[in-house]
Structures are given as structure tokens and as C-alpha cells.
Amino acid sequence: DAVTSGRLLLHELGHGEVAEFHHGDLWEPVLGRRFDVIVANLPHFPMGSNHVPGRLPSWSAGGPDGRYLLDPFLEGLERHLTPRGRAIITHNAFVSVERSREMVARSGLAVRVALTTLVYIPGDKLACMTDHVLEVEDGRSIHRYGPYAFGEMHIVEIGAPGTVG
């Protein structure tokens, strides 16, 4: 599973003693705790609950607008960061970064897009994307090169104003 794989990887890299992994219902396993760094790669691909052979049902499934898990994560983030703490998350460009920025601003946090890259979107995954999102974002944050499709993926840093960047 992801927790075991993550622990093994960090031990191999020499960081196993300073990292914690938690498994559970979003913020529930860490209620009342604050962290200097939170790293998350949430499923937030805009799609319904489609079955894709060889993939778990939760594979990338972020609900019709991609925000099913992203929004509750962002809403609870401020309660789990130390005053100078920050979160580093992946954020698909076709799932409004501006909406995320507005959400965390209500909690007194700031967002900075630290890096943008293109990520290959396999055809079976693209076929699962919510039609409306695909119509709006095709040619904007989803780019096609011949038979291949790529989506803009941001690495986003979130923290108190003055601590990000």
C-alpha cells in the first residue's frame, strides 16, 4: 500500500527517522496535531466513479469537478500547520488553482505555484474526465501532441503569508 511504499522509500533515502505516514479518513488520524511540513498527492482528477481495468476505484477519482478530496483537505489545512509550516501538494491546472487560493485565503494562508510541468494523460484516463472540464480545458491546460495528451500539473506551496516562496 501507499503508506508502506512511502516508508520504505524514505528509509532508503535516509529520511525514515524524521517522516511520519498516516492512513485514514483525511484529517482524522492527525486530529489536534500540527506539522512543519505536509506533503499530499490527492486524487483530484475530475471524473466520476468509472471502472478502469487494473486500477483501484479511487485511482485519481476526484469527483465531477476534481475537488471531492481537495476541498476538505484545503479547509482543514490551517488547523494542521505550525505557524511557519507549509504544505506541498500536487494540483492539476484544470482544477482551478484560483479557487484553491481563495479557499485557503479565508483561513489566512497563501498559495504559491512553485513549479508547473506537463504530465502525460493516458487515453483511458482522459476518456474518464468529466465532459465539461475537458471541453473547457482542452487547448488551455490540456495539450495534445498528435495522439498524446498532456495536462499541466502544478506543485503548490501553501503556508502563512510571508512563509511561502
Positions of PLM-derived features:
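Short amphipathic alpha-helical segments
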Residues: 7-8, 50-53, 100-102
